[in-house]
Amino acid sequence: LQTQVQKLLVILVLLTVLVGCSRKKDKFLSRNFHAITAEYNTLFNGRQAFEQGRDALIEGYQDNFWAILPIERLDSPDFVPLPGEAIDPSFKIAEEKAVKAIQKHSMEINGTERNPQIDEAFMLLGKARYYDLRFLRALEAFNYILSYYPASDNIAQAKIWKAKTQIRLDNTKLAIASLHKLLEEEDALDRQDFADASAMLAQGYIFENRLDSALVYIEKAAYLTRKNEEKGRYYFIKGQLYDNIGQNQLANANYDKVIDLNRRSPRRYMINAYINKIRNFDYETGDQERLFELLTDLEENRENRPYLDIIQYQFAEFYRNVGREDSAVAYYNKSIASQGEDKYLTSRDYLSLGDLNFNNSEYLIAGAYY
Protein backbone atom coordinates (compact mmCIF):
# COMPACT_ATOMS: atom_id res chain seq x y z
CA LEU A 1 0.00 0.00 0.00
CA GLN A 2 2.85 2.39 0.86
CA THR A 3 4.44 1.76 -2.56
CA GLN A 4 1.17 2.56 -4.32
CA VAL A 5 0.83 5.79 -2.33
CA GLN A 6 4.39 6.79 -3.31
CA LYS A 7 3.67 6.14 -6.99
CA LEU A 8 0.48 8.20 -6.76
CA LEU A 9 2.40 11.08 -5.17
CA VAL A 10 5.03 11.00 -7.95
CA ILE A 11 2.29 11.11 -10.61
CA LEU A 12 0.60 14.03 -8.86
CA VAL A 13 3.90 15.94 -8.66
CA LEU A 14 4.57 15.37 -12.37
CA LEU A 15 1.08 16.51 -13.29
CA THR A 16 1.55 19.63 -11.16
CA VAL A 17 4.84 20.40 -12.93
CA LEU A 18 3.31 19.92 -16.38
CA VAL A 19 0.32 22.08 -15.52
CA GLY A 20 2.71 24.73 -14.27
CA CYS A 21 4.59 24.69 -17.57
CA SER A 22 1.96 26.66 -19.43
CA ARG A 23 3.06 28.43 -22.62
CA LYS A 24 1.14 31.46 -21.37
CA LYS A 25 2.99 31.78 -18.06
CA ASP A 26 6.25 33.71 -17.98
CA LYS A 27 7.85 31.69 -15.21
CA PHE A 28 11.33 30.23 -14.97
CA LEU A 29 9.98 26.65 -14.98
CA SER A 30 7.77 27.28 -18.01
CA ARG A 31 10.51 28.99 -20.02
CA ASN A 32 13.05 26.28 -19.37
CA PHE A 33 10.65 23.39 -19.90
CA HIS A 34 9.66 24.64 -23.34
CA ALA A 35 13.21 25.66 -24.26
CA ILE A 36 14.63 22.26 -23.31
CA THR A 37 11.79 20.36 -25.00
CA ALA A 38 12.22 22.36 -28.21
CA GLU A 39 16.02 22.08 -28.17
CA TYR A 40 16.55 18.43 -27.27
CA ASN A 41 13.63 16.83 -29.05
CA THR A 42 11.94 18.61 -31.90
CA LEU A 43 14.78 20.90 -33.03
CA PHE A 44 17.43 18.23 -32.56
CA ASN A 45 15.57 15.87 -34.89
CA GLY A 46 14.97 18.72 -37.35
CA ARG A 47 18.63 19.67 -37.43
CA GLN A 48 19.61 16.05 -37.96
CA ALA A 49 17.26 15.79 -40.94
CA PHE A 50 18.54 19.07 -42.38
CA GLU A 51 22.20 18.01 -42.12
CA GLN A 52 21.40 14.67 -43.76
CA GLY A 53 19.67 16.43 -46.63
CA ARG A 54 22.47 18.95 -47.13
CA ASP A 55 25.19 16.27 -46.94
CA ALA A 56 23.33 14.17 -49.52
CA LEU A 57 23.00 17.20 -51.80
CA ILE A 58 26.71 18.04 -51.57
CA GLU A 59 27.74 14.41 -52.06
CA GLY A 60 25.48 13.89 -55.07
CA TYR A 61 26.03 17.25 -56.75
CA GLN A 62 27.71 17.00 -60.15
CA ASP A 63 30.12 19.92 -60.43
CA ASN A 64 31.02 21.23 -63.88
CA PHE A 65 34.76 21.74 -63.58
CA TRP A 66 34.88 23.27 -67.07
CA ALA A 67 33.25 26.42 -65.65
CA ILE A 68 33.76 28.48 -62.49
CA LEU A 69 32.24 26.45 -59.68
CA PRO A 70 29.37 27.94 -57.68
CA ILE A 71 30.20 28.81 -54.08
CA GLU A 72 27.46 26.54 -52.80
CA ARG A 73 25.60 23.69 -54.42
CA LEU A 74 21.87 23.68 -55.02
CA ASP A 75 19.75 21.72 -57.44
CA SER A 76 19.30 23.36 -60.82
CA PRO A 77 17.59 26.75 -60.51
CA ASP A 78 15.53 25.74 -63.55
CA PHE A 79 13.92 22.95 -61.53
CA VAL A 80 10.76 24.10 -59.79
CA PRO A 81 9.17 21.58 -57.39
CA LEU A 82 5.45 20.92 -57.68
CA PRO A 83 3.21 22.03 -54.78
CA GLY A 84 3.88 19.72 -51.85
CA GLU A 85 6.92 18.18 -53.57
CA ALA A 86 10.28 18.38 -51.78
CA ILE A 87 13.76 18.42 -53.32
CA ASP A 88 14.81 15.98 -50.61
CA PRO A 89 12.46 14.47 -47.99
CA SER A 90 14.98 15.42 -45.30
CA PHE A 91 14.34 19.13 -45.91
CA LYS A 92 10.60 18.55 -45.61
CA ILE A 93 11.13 16.77 -42.28
CA ALA A 94 13.37 19.61 -41.06
CA GLU A 95 10.70 22.15 -41.98
CA GLU A 96 7.98 20.15 -40.22
CA LYS A 97 10.08 19.87 -37.04
CA ALA A 98 10.77 23.62 -37.09
CA VAL A 99 7.06 24.40 -37.49
CA LYS A 100 6.20 21.96 -34.69
CA ALA A 101 8.72 23.60 -32.35
CA ILE A 102 7.25 27.03 -33.09
CA GLN A 103 3.64 25.91 -32.70
CA LYS A 104 4.11 23.84 -29.53
CA HIS A 105 6.83 25.68 -27.68
CA SER A 106 6.54 29.35 -28.60
CA MET A 107 5.91 31.52 -25.51
CA GLU A 108 4.93 34.90 -26.91
CA ILE A 109 3.71 36.92 -23.92
CA ASN A 110 2.82 40.60 -24.18
CA GLY A 111 4.41 40.76 -27.63
CA THR A 112 7.74 39.27 -26.48
CA GLU A 113 9.00 35.74 -27.16
CA ARG A 114 10.12 34.16 -23.88
CA ASN A 115 11.43 30.85 -25.25
CA PRO A 116 15.07 31.44 -26.27
CA GLN A 117 15.00 28.51 -28.71
CA ILE A 118 12.29 29.78 -31.04
CA ASP A 119 14.69 31.90 -33.11
CA GLU A 120 16.63 28.67 -33.69
CA ALA A 121 13.43 27.12 -35.01
CA PHE A 122 12.92 30.00 -37.44
CA MET A 123 16.53 29.65 -38.66
CA LEU A 124 15.98 25.95 -39.31
CA LEU A 125 12.69 26.76 -41.03
CA GLY A 126 14.36 29.26 -43.37
CA LYS A 127 17.31 26.98 -44.18
CA ALA A 128 15.06 24.01 -44.96
CA ARG A 129 12.95 26.13 -47.31
CA TYR A 130 16.06 27.61 -48.93
CA TYR A 131 17.47 24.20 -49.83
CA ASP A 132 14.00 23.19 -51.00
CA LEU A 133 14.25 26.11 -53.50
CA ARG A 134 11.29 27.95 -51.93
CA PHE A 135 13.18 31.19 -51.63
CA LEU A 136 10.32 33.60 -50.90
CA ARG A 137 9.12 31.42 -48.03
CA ALA A 138 12.69 31.14 -46.76
CA LEU A 139 12.98 34.94 -46.85
CA GLU A 140 9.90 35.19 -44.62
CA ALA A 141 11.59 33.11 -41.91
CA PHE A 142 14.86 35.09 -41.97
CA ASN A 143 12.97 38.41 -41.96
CA TYR A 144 10.97 37.22 -38.95
CA ILE A 145 14.16 36.70 -36.94
CA LEU A 146 15.54 40.10 -37.96
CA SER A 147 12.26 41.82 -37.06
CA TYR A 148 11.32 40.09 -33.81
CA TYR A 149 14.59 38.77 -32.36
CA PRO A 150 17.04 41.71 -32.54
CA ALA A 151 19.07 40.36 -29.60
CA SER A 152 19.31 36.83 -31.02
CA ASP A 153 22.64 35.05 -31.32
CA ASN A 154 21.49 34.16 -34.84
CA ILE A 155 21.27 37.72 -36.16
CA ALA A 156 24.49 37.47 -38.20
CA GLN A 157 23.49 34.11 -39.65
CA ALA A 158 19.99 35.41 -40.43
CA LYS A 159 21.51 38.36 -42.34
CA ILE A 160 23.86 36.06 -44.26
CA TRP A 161 21.07 33.65 -45.18
CA LYS A 162 18.81 36.52 -46.15
CA ALA A 163 21.53 37.79 -48.50
CA LYS A 164 22.01 34.28 -49.94
CA THR A 165 18.28 34.15 -50.59
CA GLN A 166 18.31 37.59 -52.22
CA ILE A 167 21.05 36.40 -54.59
CA ARG A 168 18.88 33.41 -55.55
CA LEU A 169 16.03 35.84 -56.23
CA ASP A 170 18.30 37.88 -58.55
CA ASN A 171 18.51 40.78 -56.10
CA THR A 172 22.30 40.56 -56.23
CA LYS A 173 23.13 44.25 -55.77
CA LEU A 174 20.90 44.42 -52.69
CA ALA A 175 22.56 41.31 -51.26
CA ILE A 176 26.06 42.70 -51.87
CA ALA A 177 25.17 45.96 -50.10
CA SER A 178 23.73 44.15 -47.07
CA LEU A 179 26.73 41.82 -46.80
CA HIS A 180 29.15 44.77 -46.93
CA LYS A 181 27.19 46.40 -44.12
CA LEU A 182 27.41 43.18 -42.10
CA LEU A 183 31.18 42.90 -42.61
CA GLU A 184 31.61 46.45 -41.33
CA GLU A 185 30.45 45.02 -38.00
CA GLU A 186 33.48 42.71 -38.05
CA ASP A 187 33.92 42.73 -34.27
CA ALA A 188 30.44 41.26 -33.87
CA LEU A 189 31.11 38.33 -36.22
CA ASP A 190 32.77 35.08 -35.32
CA ARG A 191 35.30 33.55 -37.71
CA GLN A 192 32.89 31.22 -39.53
CA ASP A 193 30.22 33.91 -39.93
CA PHE A 194 32.86 36.17 -41.50
CA ALA A 195 33.89 33.34 -43.83
CA ASP A 196 30.28 32.63 -44.82
CA ALA A 197 29.53 36.29 -45.51
CA SER A 198 32.74 36.69 -47.53
CA ALA A 199 31.95 33.59 -49.59
CA MET A 200 28.50 34.87 -50.49
CA LEU A 201 29.94 38.28 -51.37
CA ALA A 202 32.31 36.50 -53.74
CA GLN A 203 29.35 34.64 -55.26
CA GLY A 204 27.47 37.90 -55.72
CA TYR A 205 30.44 39.51 -57.47
CA ILE A 206 30.87 36.46 -59.72
CA PHE A 207 27.23 36.76 -60.77
CA GLU A 208 27.90 40.45 -61.50
CA ASN A 209 31.05 39.47 -63.46
CA ARG A 210 33.19 41.60 -61.13
CA LEU A 211 35.92 39.00 -60.80
CA ASP A 212 38.55 41.28 -59.22
CA SER A 213 36.17 42.00 -56.34
CA ALA A 214 35.23 38.32 -56.11
CA LEU A 215 38.91 37.43 -55.67
CA VAL A 216 39.22 39.66 -52.60
CA TYR A 217 36.38 37.93 -50.77
CA ILE A 218 36.98 34.34 -51.88
CA GLU A 219 40.49 34.69 -50.41
CA LYS A 220 39.04 35.80 -47.07
CA ALA A 221 36.50 32.98 -47.12
CA ALA A 222 39.13 30.34 -47.93
CA TYR A 223 41.46 31.57 -45.21
CA LEU A 224 38.82 31.90 -42.49
CA THR A 225 36.56 28.90 -42.97
CA ARG A 226 37.05 26.08 -40.48
CA LYS A 227 35.58 23.52 -42.90
CA ASN A 228 38.19 21.81 -45.05
CA GLU A 229 35.66 20.89 -47.75
CA GLU A 230 34.90 24.59 -48.16
CA LYS A 231 38.57 25.53 -47.96
CA GLY A 232 39.42 23.21 -50.86
CA ARG A 233 36.47 24.46 -52.90
CA TYR A 234 37.17 28.14 -52.27
CA TYR A 235 40.87 27.90 -53.16
CA PHE A 236 39.93 25.99 -56.31
CA ILE A 237 37.43 28.70 -57.29
CA LYS A 238 40.06 31.33 -56.58
CA GLY A 239 42.38 29.52 -58.99
CA GLN A 240 39.63 29.45 -61.61
CA LEU A 241 39.05 33.19 -61.19
CA TYR A 242 42.74 33.92 -61.73
CA ASP A 243 42.73 31.66 -64.81
CA ASN A 244 39.71 33.56 -66.09
CA ILE A 245 41.57 36.88 -65.99
CA GLY A 246 44.75 35.41 -67.48
CA GLN A 247 46.83 35.24 -64.29
CA ASN A 248 47.96 31.62 -64.67
CA GLN A 249 50.82 31.71 -62.18
CA LEU A 250 48.56 33.04 -59.44
CA ALA A 251 45.99 30.44 -60.45
CA ASN A 252 48.58 27.67 -60.07
CA ALA A 253 49.57 28.96 -56.63
CA ASN A 254 45.97 28.49 -55.48
CA TYR A 255 45.68 25.06 -57.11
CA ASP A 256 48.79 24.13 -55.10
CA LYS A 257 46.91 25.08 -51.92
CA VAL A 258 44.14 22.69 -52.93
CA ILE A 259 46.67 19.92 -53.62
CA ASP A 260 48.39 20.54 -50.28
CA LEU A 261 45.10 19.89 -48.45
CA ASN A 262 45.32 16.33 -49.80
CA ARG A 263 42.92 14.04 -47.90
CA ARG A 264 41.52 16.83 -45.77
CA SER A 265 39.47 17.97 -48.75
CA PRO A 266 37.50 15.92 -51.33
CA ARG A 267 39.71 14.25 -53.93
CA ARG A 268 37.77 15.74 -56.85
CA TYR A 269 39.19 19.17 -56.00
CA MET A 270 42.75 17.88 -55.84
CA ILE A 271 42.53 15.99 -59.16
CA ASN A 272 41.01 18.95 -60.98
CA ALA A 273 43.59 21.26 -59.42
CA TYR A 274 46.29 19.06 -61.01
CA ILE A 275 44.38 19.08 -64.32
CA ASN A 276 44.07 22.87 -64.38
CA LYS A 277 47.76 23.28 -63.58
CA ILE A 278 48.60 20.93 -66.45
CA ARG A 279 46.43 23.00 -68.80
CA ASN A 280 48.48 26.03 -67.78
CA PHE A 281 51.74 24.26 -68.68
CA ASP A 282 54.02 26.15 -71.05
CA TYR A 283 55.29 23.59 -73.60
CA GLU A 284 58.02 25.95 -74.81
CA THR A 285 59.69 26.62 -71.47
CA GLY A 286 58.33 23.92 -69.16
CA ASP A 287 59.89 20.58 -68.17
CA GLN A 288 58.04 18.12 -70.42
CA GLU A 289 59.66 15.05 -68.84
CA ARG A 290 58.48 16.12 -65.40
CA LEU A 291 54.96 16.69 -66.76
CA PHE A 292 54.99 13.19 -68.31
CA GLU A 293 55.98 11.71 -64.93
CA LEU A 294 53.17 13.60 -63.18
CA LEU A 295 50.56 12.37 -65.68
CA THR A 296 51.88 8.81 -65.34
CA ASP A 297 51.66 8.98 -61.54
CA LEU A 298 48.11 10.31 -61.71
CA GLU A 299 47.04 7.58 -64.14
CA GLU A 300 48.63 4.74 -62.17
CA ASN A 301 47.33 5.80 -58.76
CA ARG A 302 44.48 3.39 -57.93
CA GLU A 303 42.70 6.07 -55.91
CA ASN A 304 42.29 8.07 -59.11
CA ARG A 305 40.23 5.47 -60.98
CA PRO A 306 37.03 7.57 -60.81
CA TYR A 307 38.96 10.34 -62.61
CA LEU A 308 40.70 8.30 -65.32
CA ASP A 309 38.63 9.87 -68.09
CA ILE A 310 39.90 13.40 -67.43
CA ILE A 311 43.46 12.23 -66.63
CA GLN A 312 43.65 10.25 -69.89
CA TYR A 313 42.18 13.15 -71.85
CA GLN A 314 44.91 15.39 -70.45
CA PHE A 315 47.51 12.74 -71.29
CA ALA A 316 46.18 12.80 -74.88
CA GLU A 317 46.53 16.59 -74.92
CA PHE A 318 50.12 16.21 -73.73
CA TYR A 319 50.96 13.79 -76.56
CA ARG A 320 49.24 16.05 -79.08
CA ASN A 321 51.27 19.05 -77.91
CA VAL A 322 54.59 17.17 -78.19
CA GLY A 323 53.75 15.88 -81.69
CA ARG A 324 53.02 12.23 -80.89
CA GLU A 325 49.66 11.92 -82.62
CA ASP A 326 49.39 8.12 -82.49
CA SER A 327 49.73 8.19 -78.70
CA ALA A 328 47.27 11.10 -78.53
CA VAL A 329 44.68 9.08 -80.48
CA ALA A 330 45.19 6.10 -78.18
CA TYR A 331 44.60 8.22 -75.08
CA TYR A 332 41.55 10.03 -76.45
CA ASN A 333 40.07 6.57 -77.03
CA LYS A 334 41.11 5.47 -73.54
CA SER A 335 39.34 8.50 -72.12
CA ILE A 336 36.16 7.58 -74.02
CA ALA A 337 36.42 3.95 -72.88
CA SER A 338 36.65 5.02 -69.23
CA GLN A 339 32.95 5.98 -69.50
CA GLY A 340 32.95 8.73 -66.91
CA GLU A 341 29.93 10.87 -66.07
CA ASP A 342 31.31 13.98 -67.80
CA LYS A 343 29.49 14.02 -71.14
CA TYR A 344 31.12 17.29 -72.15
CA LEU A 345 34.54 15.64 -71.74
CA THR A 346 33.43 12.79 -74.02
CA SER A 347 32.39 15.33 -76.64
CA ARG A 348 35.84 16.93 -76.36
CA ASP A 349 37.45 13.53 -76.95
CA TYR A 350 35.41 12.99 -80.11
CA LEU A 351 36.02 16.54 -81.31
CA SER A 352 39.78 16.14 -80.84
CA LEU A 353 39.77 12.84 -82.74
CA GLY A 354 37.78 14.51 -85.50
CA ASP A 355 40.23 17.40 -85.71
CA LEU A 356 43.26 15.09 -85.88
CA ASN A 357 41.73 13.12 -88.75
CA PHE A 358 40.59 16.27 -90.55
CA ASN A 359 44.11 17.71 -90.36
CA ASN A 360 45.39 14.47 -91.90
CA SER A 361 42.85 14.77 -94.75
CA GLU A 362 40.86 11.79 -93.41
CA TYR A 363 37.60 13.60 -93.99
CA LEU A 364 35.21 10.64 -93.83
CA ILE A 365 36.67 9.45 -90.53
CA ALA A 366 36.66 13.02 -89.22
CA GLY A 367 32.99 13.37 -90.16
CA ALA A 368 32.13 10.24 -88.19
CA TYR A 369 33.72 11.72 -85.06
CA TYR A 370 32.04 15.09 -85.56
Model region roles, listed by residue range:
Residues 1-9:
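Bacterial N-terminal signal peptides that target proteins for export
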Residues 13-21:
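Hydrophobic h-region of N-terminal signal peptides that target proteins for export
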Residues 20-370:
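Acidic, polar-rich low-complexity tracts and alpha-helical solenoid repeat scaffolds
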Residues 9-10, 229:
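Sequence-pattern detector for short linear motifs
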